[in-house]
Amino acid sequence: MNNFGEDFIFGGATAAYQAEGATKEDGKGPCIWDEYLKKEGRFTGDTASDFYHKYKEDLKFSRKFGVNGIRISIAWSRVIPDGKGEVNPKGLKFYSDLIDECIKNNVEPFVTLHHFDTPLTLFKDGDWLNRNNIDYFVRFAKVCFEALGDRVKKWITFNEAWAVAQNGYIIGNFPPSIKYDIPKAAQSMHNMMVAHAKVVELYKSMNLDGEIGIVHTLEGKYPITDSKEDKEAAYLDYMISNKFMLDACFKGEYPKETEKTINEIMSKNGGELKIYDGDLEVLKKASSKIDFLGMNYYSSHFLKAYEGESRIHHNGTGEKGTSIFALKGIGERVNNPEVPTTDWDWPIYPKGLHDMLVRIKNEYPNYKKIYVTENGMGYKDDFKDGKIDDTPRIDYINKHLEAILKAKNEGVVVKGYFVWSLMDVLSWSNGYNKRYGLFYVDFKTQNRYAKKSAYWFKRISYEKKLIDFSDIEY
């Protein structure tokens, strides 16, 4: 069956820091990225895509091109500038106006509470390694629910807790720029899952007319050969990257196998996971109340056994073939010569999306529904005569939508797909040369231009089925 269904969301995704700009306007406090990017000195988010001032235009574009859902996030430090003190009414008003504009344009808002942008004050106090962050986050969520919960029907607690942990404490390309500290990464992930569970409990206690879920980045993990050692490496990477958090969210516990495996990884890296009194009870209570899983999928990894110390080189330039990723006690991610990659060395493997969707259905039968909340292709778009022919992006998205249809036909409940990104936005580690948007942003003028992919996306959104993109007039 080639039909997605009448209620399927064809959305576009954004994030506050990557899109809004206005980092110092209307009482916004600093977040972790303001200081970090200033020190790095390569680019800033001060203007980004200027969504703060141009959201009405972007939502009109969305309506015109059949985008019927949008992922936005609420900048914690725009609403509570230091993360824990007084509420900034101008910050709340911006999001209230933004939500109203979404509804006016028939674009359903999916609203994320944490998308990589902890307020600077709380970051300096330890971020998600500091348990106080949990209570501050719950309070922030309550402020948002009270102000916007009458209109927002889809809430997301966290975007990609694994990415927060991996990039901040293992790769080191996000603040606090620590490398190879797997124990800190795992501890921060656990603490975020406790915060997630407490926010789910809070939301349900408020009897609001809506749903709440979480977004995980879920990557397939495959052995590069059939050897026992390579299979073990793929298993270990899957455990730390995916199963650790999925078990917390949907089982409300760390089953014996998960607990044993995570502790072995921690031990090999000189640490241990600390679970505090009451944590597991909180996870268990929330696990039956989560309404949906948001799944971000860009690529899968191929693993081989690795016995050495951790070694990572992050490809942040688009210089193909420069990535290195080997973790002590886990394995090494390697290229599969049969699988193409992007310029940033991300394997293009739609089968991994299908496999992951089916795995969720089989391993977590209590899941209710899935939204693919991010998927897209970073590309050095060629802007010629006011047009961008991004056929490789269309091909990438088309193949991943085919994988979703296959999973739906096998009984997986998938209710929406959000392309990353709605318009070109700031890339956390690549700045402005890595573009994902349906709409091209000229960052000098902030003018928007529809890419060929936008015209194709409009057709599939209206027809609720895949179409031959060679037929698109552009």
UniProtKB/Swiss-Prot annotation:
GO cellular component terms listed in the entry, alphabetical order: cytosol
Family annotation (Pfam families): Glyco_hydro_1
Entry annotation: catalytic residues: 160, 374
Domain of life: Bacteria
Residues that, per the record, bind D-galactose 6-phosphate: 18, 115, 159-160, 296, 427-428, 434, 436
Pathway in which the depicted protein is active: Carbohydrate metabolism; lactose degradation; D-galactose 6-phosphate and beta-D-glucose from lactose 6-phosphate: step 1/1
Catalysis performed (reactions): a 6-phospho-beta-D-galactoside + H2O = D-galactose 6-phosphate + an alcohol
Signal sequence coordinates: none
MF annotations from Gene Ontology: 6-phospho-beta-galactosidase activity; beta-glucosidase activity
SUPFAM superfamilies given in the database record: (Trans)glycosidases (SSF51445)
EC number(s) on file: 3.2.1.85
Keywords: Glycosidase, Hydrolase
InterPro entries for the chain: 6P-beta-galactosidase, Glyco_hydro_1, Glyco_hydro_1_AS, Glyco_hydro_1_N_CS, Glycoside_hydrolase_SF
Entry's Gene Ontology BP terms: lactose catabolic process via tagatose-6-phosphate
NCBIfam families per record: lacG, PRK13511.1
HAMAP family: LacG
Matching PANTHER family: GLYCOSYL HYDROLASE (PTHR10353), LP05116P (PTHR10353:SF36)
Family stated for the protein in its record: Belongs to the glycosyl hydrolase 1 family.
Protein name: 6-phospho-beta-galactosidase
